[in-house]
C-alpha cells in the first residue's frame, strides 16, 4: 500500500548524491551479459510490499533461472509498512523498485531522480465494495454515506470517481480512515470500503456470513471498480534512478532484467499452480488459498495487454498524471519523460523472437475457489 513519503525525501536526495557511485549490487555495471570471466551482474529489486503473489513474476523469474539466463544475479528485497521503494532506490540500495505510478510522480515532483521503465500492471485493482442489500450499487449512490478508504495517498482514485459523479469528497460524504483490513466493513461500521481485487476483496470472501454459516460470496457484494469509473490510476511498475539508466551498460542490464521478469510473469500466467508454489516457497504471511486468489487477480491486471507486457499506454499515463495533479499529489504537471518505454519494448521484442506470447490475448482467468481464512 502507499504511504506518506514527504518527510524522507530531502534526506534521500542528499543520499542520492553520496550513493550514486555505491550502494546495492553492481551499481555501475556496463554492458554484456555479465563481467569478464562469466560473472553475473548483481542487482537488487526492492518490492513494494511483503512477499505475496502480487510479485509472483519476479520470484518465478528467479526460481526458474530466467535471471541467470540473462547473466543477472538478482537479490529480491521484501517491502513493508516502513519501507519506501523510492527511498531505497534513490539511496543506492537497489537498482530496481516496484511502486504505483502516482508515487513515482510525487517523488519526481520533489526532484527525486527516478523514472518508470516498465508498467507491468496494465489496469487498476482498486475498488470500493458495498453490501448488496444496501442498494449502494454505484459511486453516485454513495452521496451522504460513510465511505472508508486508506489515506496517505491511497484515496485519490476514489476521490476522482466521486467528483466525476458530482460528489464533493470533502462535504458530500463522510470519509472514514480505513485500516489495512476489512473489519469496519464486515462490522457494517462503514457503508463502503476500499478493497484491492487481489487482497482485501478476498479477505471479505474468506469470512463466514453469520446469517448463513457459509462464506460470503460475490453475490453478497457490489464491487465498484475504479478502472470502470475511468479513474483507475496505474499501479505496479518498475522504476530506476534517472542517472543510473543513462549509462549504456545499465540500459543493457535493464533490458535483460525486464526480459527475464516479463518471462516470469508469462510463466505465472501459463503455469499458475507451479507459480503459486514458488510464492509459497518464499514464505508469504497469508495462506495458500489467499495467494491462489491473489495470483489469479494479479494476472487479470496484467493480461491481456495489446502493447505487450510492461509497455506503458500513454493514455493511461495521462489519466494517472491528471488524477495526481487534480488531488495535490503533484504541484507541477507530470512530463512524459517520467517514463521510458525503450527497454520494455526491447524486452518484449526479444521475447517475441523467442516465441513467447507477450500479449496474453487468449488467456482466460480460471475460476478460483475461495477458502475459509485464506488457508
Positions of the model-derived regions?
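Conserved C-terminal helix/tail region of periplasmic/extracytoplasmic solute-binding proteins
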Residues: 318-375
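Bacterial N-terminal signal peptides that target proteins for export
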Residues: 1-9
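Bacterial N-terminal signal peptides
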Residues: 10-19
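Bacterial lipoprotein signal-peptidase II cleavage site
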Residues: 18-36
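A bilobed periplasmic-binding-protein/Venus flytrap-type ligand-binding module shared by bacterial periplasmic
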Residues: 60, 126-136, 234-251, 305
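Pocket-lining segment of extracytoplasmic ligand-binding domains
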Residues: 102, 180-183, 190-285
Amino acid at each position: 500500500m502507499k504511504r506518506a513519503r514527504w518527510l524522507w525525501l530531502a534526506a534521500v536526495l542528499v543520499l542520492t548524491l553520496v550513493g550514486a557511485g555505491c550502494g546495492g549490487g553492481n551499481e555501475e555495471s556496463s554492458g554484456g551479459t555479465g563481467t569478464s570471466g562469466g560473472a553475473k551482474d548483481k542487482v537488487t529489486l526492492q518490492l513494494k510490499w511483503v512477499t505475496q503473489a502480487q510479485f509472483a513474476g519476479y520470484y518465478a523469474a528467479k526460481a526458474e533461472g530466467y535471471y541467470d539466463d540473462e547473466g543477472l544475479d538478482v537479490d529480491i528485497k521484501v517491502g513493508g509498512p516502513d519501507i519506501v521503494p523510492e527511498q531505497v532506490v534513490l539511496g543506492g540500495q537497489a537498482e530496481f523498485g516496484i511502486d504505483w505510478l502516482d508515487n513515482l510522480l510525487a517523488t519526481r515532483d520533489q526532484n527525486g531522480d527516478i523514472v518508470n521503465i516498465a508498467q507491468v500492471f496494465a489496469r487498476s485493482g482498486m475498488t470500493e465494495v458495498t453490501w448488496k442489500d444496501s442498494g449502494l450499487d454505484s459511486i453516485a449512490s454513495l452521496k451522504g454515506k460513510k465511505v472508508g478508504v486508506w489515506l496517505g495517498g491511497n484515496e485519490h482514485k476514489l476521490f476522482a470517481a466521486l467528483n466525476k459523479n458530482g460528489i464533493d469528497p470533502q462535504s458530500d460524504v463522510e470519509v472514514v480512515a480505513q485500516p489495512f483490513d476489512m473489519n469496519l466493513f464486515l462490522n457494517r461500521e462503514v457503508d463502503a470500503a476500499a478493497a484491492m481485487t487481489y487482497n482485501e476483496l478476498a479477505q471479505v470472501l474468506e469470512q463466514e456470513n453469520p446469517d448463513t454459516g457459509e462464506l460470503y460470496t460475490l453475490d453478497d457484494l457490489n464491487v465498484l471498480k475504479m478502472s470502470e469509473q475511468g479513474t483507475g490510476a496505474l499501479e505496479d511498475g518498475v522504476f530506476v534512478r534517472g542517472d543510473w539508466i543513462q549509462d549504456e551498460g545499465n540500459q543493457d542490464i535493464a533490458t535483460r532484467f525486464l526480459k527475464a521478469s516479463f518471462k516470469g510473469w508469462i510463466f505465472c500466467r501459463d503455469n499458475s499452480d507451479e507459480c503459486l508454489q514458488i510464492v509459497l516457497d518464499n514464505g508469504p504471511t497469508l495462506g495458500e488459498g489467499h495467494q491462489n486468489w491473489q495470483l489469479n487477480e494479479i494476472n487479470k491486471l496484467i493480461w491481456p495487454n495489446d502493447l505487450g507486457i510492461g509497455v506503458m499506454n500513454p493514455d493511461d499515463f495521462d489519466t494517472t498524471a491528471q488524477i495526481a495533479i487534480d488531488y495535490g499529489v503533484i504541484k507541477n504537471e507530470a512530463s512524459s519523460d517520467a517514463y521510458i518505454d525503450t527497454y520494455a519494448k526491447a524486452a518484449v521484442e526479444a521475447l517475441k523472437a523467442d516465441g513467447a506470447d507477450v500479449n496474453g490475448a487468449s488467456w482466460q482467468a480460471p475460476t478460483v475457489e475461495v477458502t475459509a481464512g485464506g488457508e
